[in-house]
C-alpha cells in the first residue's frame, strides 16, 4: 500500500503540474467578472466536467485498447474524428504558447525595462519576446528528449505558484480583509460574465492530453485508480484557484485586471515571483511544443498503415523537426505580440479549442461506445454552448476591452507606476466604505491635486511666475490623468510647473553649479516618483529623496531623461557632449593604473580639466536651455527645499544673468582646449610607458647577448671535455666502488666521506646550515651561481642515476621539478655514454689507491685561489648583467663554493668534460634519486622546487648546474649539518680518488659561478670533475667496488657539474622565456645574484 500510495501521489503531482499554468493569473479577473459566489461555483462545475471527460477517455481506452487520444477518435469516428482531435490539440497548444508569450511580455517588460533604464514600450516588449524565444524557448524546444529536465522545472514552477498564492493571501490582509470594507466593494453574482469566464475556467483545468499517458504508466491500469488520481489532482487545483481568485479579487476589487501580478507594488518578493513566472513559463514551452509538434507531424505527414491505423510517435526527420519547431515558436511569438492581454487569448482559446478537447471530443467518443450516458450528454452540450456563445462573447468583449480595461489596465500592464496607482486607489477605497470604487479613485486623485497645488504655491508663491496657478492646476491634472507617470516622458507645458519642474531646472543648473552635478541629476527621477505626487505628497520633498537616490544612477542614464524632460531641440546636442566627456576621464584613469606612481601630477591635472569640461558643458546646456524665466525658479525650488521664498526670488535672477554671461562665452572653445590638454596628459603617460618598455627591451637584449656568450663558452667546454675524457681514460684509475642501490650508496658515501672529509668539508656543511634561508633562494638564484655544497650533494644523484637509469624514472616523481632537465639531458647522455663508459673504466683502476690520502689536503689548499677568482668573475659578470652585486654577496658565494669546489677540483678535471653532459642529464635524474637518500630534506626541497617551479625552469635552462643546486640547496636546509659534512667529505674522498684532476674541485664550485661569461675555466673544471665522477659511477657497477660505493656516493653530488651543460640548453630557452616574462625574470635574477654573491663572500 505504501508503494502504491507513493506512486499515486507522484502521479497526482505530475497531473497538478500539467494543469496549473499561467491561467491562475486570471482567476481574480474571472471572480470580478462573475462575482465571488458564482465564480467559485463555476470553478467547481468546470472541475467536475473535467473529471468526467477524463473518465470518458479512460473508459473508452480500456474498452478499445487504444492508448492515444487521436487513436480513440479514429477508432470512434474514423479519420474525421482523428483530424478533429489533432487540430484541436494543435490549436490548444498554440493558444497556450501565445498565452505564455503574453505573460512574458507583461511581466518581463515591467521587470527588465527598469533594470536596463528603459521605458516600457511596445518596441521593448517585442524585443523582449524575440530575445526570450531565441535564447530560451528555441534551444529548449530543439531538444528531442527534455522530459526529465522539464518535469523538474515544472516542479519548480509549482513552488512559484505556491509562493504566489501566499503573496496573494497576504496582500488581501494588507488591503483590509478583516476590516470588512471589501464586502461592499465586491460583487457576488454577475451573470454577465459567465460566458466569458467559463472558457477560461475550462482551459485552466485542461489536462485531457495527460490522461492516457498517465493511464498507460500505471503498473496495474484500472479505471478506479485513474478516477482517484484525477479526482485528487482536480480537488487540489480547484482549491488553489478559488483561493487565488478570492483573495486577489478582495485585494484589488474593481481595479483587478487580467494579470493580477501587475497590481503588486515593486518589491523583492513580487519581483522574484514575476521573474519566477517568466522563467517557469519560458521553460514550460517545450511541454506545449512537444505534443503540438507531434500532432502536426502526424496530421501533415503521417500515412495510414495497411491495417488502417496510424503509427503513433514515429521518428521525425531532423529537417522536419527543426522546421516545425521554428514555425511553432516564432508563429506563437507573433501571436503574443499582436494580442493585447492574457484574458483575451485564454478566453478565445478556451472557448474554441479548449471546449473541443476538454468537453466535446471526450463526450462524443464516450457516447459512441455507450449509448446511454446522461453525464456525457451534459458535458457535450455544455461544451457546445461554450464553443458557440463564449467565442462570440470573448470576441465582442475583446473589442470593447480597450475602452474599459485596457485604457487604464493595459497601460498599467506596461508600467509599474500605473499598477501602483491602482493599488493605492484600492487601498484608499478600503478606507472609505461609503464611496463606490470608481468614484473613489477619482475623488482620491483630486485631493491629491489640491495638495499638490498648495505645496507648490507654498514654495513658489513669492515668485511671480508667468503662467500663474491656473496653468499649474491644469498641468497637474493632465499629468495625473496620464497613466505612465513613472516614465520620464514629459508632455510639453504639462510638466513645467509640476514637481518635475526642478527636474528641468536642475538640468540647467547642472552645468552652472559645477560643484554638485549629482544633486541636480535627481530631477530625472521625479517623473518616476510621479505617483507619490499624484497621491498628494509634497513636491519639495521629492528633490531630496531623488538627490539621495540619484547619485546611485549614472550621469549618462540621467541626462537622457533630462533631455526628454526639457523637450528642447538644443538639449540633445548637450547630451553627446556631456556623455562624451566623461569617457575621456575614465580613459585617463584606465591608462594610469599602472603608471600612477610615474605621473601623479598629470593625473590630478587631467581630472581637474575634466571637471572643468563637465562644468563647461553644463554651462553650454544652460545657455541652450536658458531664456525661460521659470527654469531658474526651478533650480531655486530645488535648492530651497525648506521653502525659503526670498532666496527663491533672488536666485532666478542670478541664474538668468549666469545664463546670459554663459551665452556670451564660447563654452565649446574651452571644452576643446581642455580636451587638448587632457590629450597631452595622456601622451605623457604613453611616452613614459614607451620609455619603460624600451628599457626593458634593452635589458632583455643584454641578457640575450650574455646567454649567447655563455652558450659559446659551454660549447668550448664541451670540446675540452671531450679531449679531457680521452686523456682521463688513459691517466685516471678506475674506482672500485659499486653502488648496488643508489639510495644506500648515497647514504654510505656521505657517512664515509664525512669521516674522511677535512675542515673544508665541515666548512661547506656549515655554510649551508648557517644560511638556512639560502636554499630557498638558490632554487631561484641557482641559474647565476650555486654554492658548491649543493654540487657535492648533486654528486650523489649522479652516481645513482648512472647506476639505475630505470630507477631514475621511478624517482622522477619525487623530484618532479627536475623532469624537464632530465628530458634535455637525456639527449646529451646518449651522445656521451660511450665516452663516459671508457672514462669510467680508467677511473676504476686509478681511484682505489688515491681516495683517502689525497682527499683532505687538496680541498683546503687548491680550490681557494680558483674559487676566489671564480667568485670575482661571477660577481663582475652579474654586475654587468644586472648592475648589481655587493661584496657581501661575492663573499658568501665564495664561502659556499670553497669547500665543495676544492674537493671537486681535485676529483677530476679531465673527467669533467666527458661526463659533464652525462651528469647533466643524470643530475636531473639524480635529484629525484636524491629524494630517498636525503629523506625528508629531499621532500622539503621538492616542495620548494615546485613552489618555484617557473623560475627554476627558466634559470635551469640558462644554467646547467642550477637544477642540482636547487635540489641540493633545499636539501641542505632540511638535512642536518652532519649529513652535509658527510656529503662534502664524500665529495672530498671522490676527489682524492679522482686525484688526477686536483683542480676539479674549484671547477665544481665554479659551475654556478661559471654561468657568467667569465667563468669558462671553472666550467671546464666542473665538466672534468663530472666526467670523472660519471666514469667512476659506471666503474662502480662491478660488485667488488661496491664497498667504496659510499664514498663514491658523494660523486653523485657532482651532478651539479653536468648542470653546466644543462644551463647551456636552458640558456637558449631562457632567452625566449625572458622575452615573454619581461621584468618578472629580472626580479628573479636579482635574487639569484644576491644569493650567489652571498655564497662567494662566505667562501
From Swiss-Prot:
Membrane topology of this protein: Multi-pass membrane protein
Compositionally biased tracts (Basic and acidic residues): 441-454, 493-508, 517-528, 544-561, 586-599, 653-663, 720-735, 749-766, 793-802, 852-894, 917-928, 957-969, 1010-1022
One Pfam family named in its UniProt record: Aa_trans
Reaction(s) catalysed (UniProt annotation): L-glutamate(out) = L-glutamate(in); L-glutamine(out) = L-glutamine(in); L-alanine(in) = L-alanine(out); L-serine(in) = L-serine(out)
Modification sites for Phosphoserine: 441, 607, 635, 886
Keywords carried by this UniProt record: Amino-acid transport, Coiled coil, Membrane, Phosphoprotein, Transmembrane, Transmembrane helix, Transport
GO cellular component entries: membrane
GO molecular function: active monoatomic ion transmembrane transporter activity; inorganic cation transmembrane transporter activity; L-amino acid transmembrane transporter activity; monoatomic cation transmembrane transporter activity; neutral L-amino acid transmembrane transporter activity; secondary active transmembrane transporter activity
Primary location class: membrane
UniProt KW Transmembrane helix keyword: yes
Modified residues (Phosphothreonine): 767
InterPro entries in the record: AA_transpt_TM
Tissue: Only expressed in the pituitary, adrenal gland, stomach and in the upper gastrointestinal tract.
Ranges annotated as spanning the membrane: 9-31, 36-58, 84-104, 123-143, 153-173, 229-249, 272-292, 323-343, 345-365, 378-398
GO BP, sorted A to Z: amino acid transmembrane transport; bone development; inorganic cation transmembrane transport
Taxonomic superkingdom: Eukaryota
Described function: Facilitates bidirectional transport of amino acids. May act as a glutamate sensor that regulates glutamate-glutamine cycle and mTOR signaling in the brain. The transport mechanism remains to be elucidated.
Family membership noted in the UniProt record: Belongs to the amino acid/polyamine transporter 2 family.
Protein name as it appears in the record: Solute carrier family 38 member 10
